């Protein structure tokens, strides 16, 4: 923020037309920090990234200068029938908000100036009717509101694109949400096509973002290569009040009913003190459960109207979600429970408290969620984080401190997605025939494709030309023609294929589950199926099943009565802990362990935690005793940011578990766990079950492992140089590869979601995908397969960070130690071991299992001469 210059009110008023300045003075009295910095920059035609919290006025910061410039044109009779500004957002709901938010000031300005020029605002999305689109051709809006996908289609439209040739400003809202996905790559490349093939001149790019980091990279994503930009850093202009709350004094010995009672008592106490409360959970299932329990409580205790409690998540119909949003705006609701669907800046009116149930897994998400409270620049964003266990308590305490200290984790921006590249090449050919070398230069100005290799580009051109297929199939799969090996033309039919199949969001599929004798069991979401491996146990309709495999859109299982689930049904929905946040949690563990080692007293350590992390003494004691138990149990080996501890635990079912305690973010751990499992499986010629959490991962094998098997030697066999290849081999036969291949094939127009205007059958697409996948395995360097592997390793996992960790291990910056074998798991391993239990047993029983594991730890320490219960009471 120190590099951001904030202009005075008078300086900005002097830049505006008198009647615009008068209207603003009457309505707002003063400019907000993002407005003070951004409006003058936009008036000076700078590319600008504005990063500030919800309710800080960044939307008006973007539009006020633009409206003023359009009024100037109108006052001079120079306002023509063409589009001057385009607003692009990831959500259609945001687009509807934006239209309302622009029409309101236009109507108010008309009261200040009766001769106000008629500035038109219009929406063009997939919901826009052909009639409305036709009207736009005759009388286009001066400000066009759209989505990335509709923008891509608009610039390839021969007629409508002619109305866009003089666009002066493009605003990208919620840019942080777009930048970390393939939708962002699509938009980034489309903006380059727009600049070079439609406007043929530069336009002002304005990015609006919530709290995000690093700002420099997001700004480069916005403007592309070799363009100047300015950053308005107003991320921390709103005061934030964050508190982490433990629902009970003792998270270990309290029963599940006591913890549950404590959670809802805390929620009710907070809700009573506030007008409107927004509660975030981490899964849709939890959202429904919390909303249901709150309704029951409200009914029993008569504290507020049952109808004033609603749930809001992506599985609900659009009409239901819109109804909830409308009730929120009108102030009818007391409580709304959501998963991730209300994180973005949809206008939901007045919220004065946000409650987070459990960790949001990253600092940026914590700030974004809490930022929904106090929807005004001078309001305090008030957030309460309620934890559910000791791991959650440690994690949330560290995340809250990082948020207060303004340390935000980095965004991940996908690089060189070849399926998106396929769409961009087809769209470029539809705008006009283009020289392949010229298009390559244009594409490399996009941040996402700035280091696109000539070989990958040629590979995708060959694929789109049908060169990978025999003569009989060439015409079926080709989407372009390249004349004289130079000029790219669209193939007949490509325009309709592009219009009906472009975009990057895959269709969500429900997969039928059947037994080996074809008895129907139920349905699973595709994102859950993709994390399954043969032998995995999961729960469906209250019964346990073993996953055998899949065929097309069917999952084949067999009953697994009495077996412990290895994958909880909600796990695919769980957000992964961010890398930087994980490192900070590891650092915190290390610092407490060092204090214990130095002999710092219990009370001093607890006092230090309370003061530095702003939590109460009971929560501090829970954290301290948790780390103390691990320290005493493992003889001082507390896994941290610079220590990976491999714990060898032999369980009661005859399974040897190699538990890797490692805090480096779940995406990196996902990659490492698959590499290690693959090598162990190859070396021991046995099946290896993998379980990954945010705090580490476990490799489980049958007990007949050679007694002297050196698990630590894996770090010599898996290196920064070979880990990419090993993980690639590991994922080649997974469900994830099958599912992601279909998504990439659909994005690459190899499998069509819509053909000749009609929706194609999903089951047929699944089968086609399987057939193609088998055939393509034989083709070397096939771009769709190459992209599938890249997406899994770089976007879903974090292979780059996995390499970084292995480098640090090789240089001894990160140490690796081994503990065990033992038949009692260490305190830190309990959550990893019990990962699947939440589906097969009641939560009450799961907590009882945790208590029993804890009792075994206490007994183990007692045998070592340490009475941990006395340690507690001495505090």
UniProtKB/Swiss-Prot annotation:
Coiled coil regions, renumbered to chain: none
Alphabetized SUPFAM superfamilies for the sequence: P-loop containing nucleoside triphosphate hydrolases
A matching Pfam family: Helicase_C
Helicase ATP-binding domain location: 39-230
Catalyzed reaction equations: Couples ATP hydrolysis with the unwinding of duplex DNA by translocating in the 3'-5' direction; ATP + H2O = ADP + phosphate + H(+)
Binding residue positions for ATP: 35, 58-59, 173-174, 355, 372, 375
Record keywords, A-Z: ATP-binding, DNA damage, DNA repair, DNA-binding, Helicase, Hydrolase, Isomerase, Nucleotide-binding
Matching InterPro entries: ATP-dep_Helicase, DEAD/DEAH_assoc, DEAD/DEAH_box_helicase_dom, Helicase_ATP-bd, Helicase_C-like, Lhr-like_ATP-dep_RNA_helic_prd, Lhr_WH_dom, P-loop_NTPase
Annotated EC: 5.6.2.4
Activity regulation as described: DNA topoisomerase 3 (topA) inhibits helicase activity on Holliday junctions (HJ) but has no effect on ATPase activity.
Site positions (Wedges between bases of the loading strand): 505
One of the record's GO molecular function terms: catalytic activity, acting on DNA
Intervals of motif DEIH box: 173-176
Region spans: WH domain: 420-506
CDD domains (UniProt xref): DEXHc_LHR-like, SF2_C_LHR
Domain Helicase C-terminal positions: 247-419
Disulphide bond pairs: none
Ranges for region Domain 4: 507-875
Family: Belongs to the Lhr helicase family. Lhr-Core subfamily.
Role, per record: DNA helicase that translocates in a 3'-5' direction on single-stranded (ss)DNA, probably involved in DNA repair. Unwinds DNA in a 3'-5' direction, unwinding is ATP-dependent, acts preferentially on fork and 3'-tailed DNA; bubble and blunt-ended double-stranded (ds)DNA are not substrates. Has winding and unwinding activity, unwinds Holliday junction (HJ) DNA in the presence of ATP, the main product is forked DNA, single-stranded binding protein (SSB) does not stimulate activity.
Entry remark concerning the domains of this protein: Composed of 2 helicase domains, a winged-helix (WH) domain, and Lhr-specific domain 4.
Complex formation: Monomer and homodimer. The monomeric form has helicase, ATPase and strand annealing activities, while the dimeric form only has ATPAse and strand annealing activities. Interacts with DNA topoisomerase 3 (topA).
Protein name, entry field: ATP-dependent helicase Lhr-Core
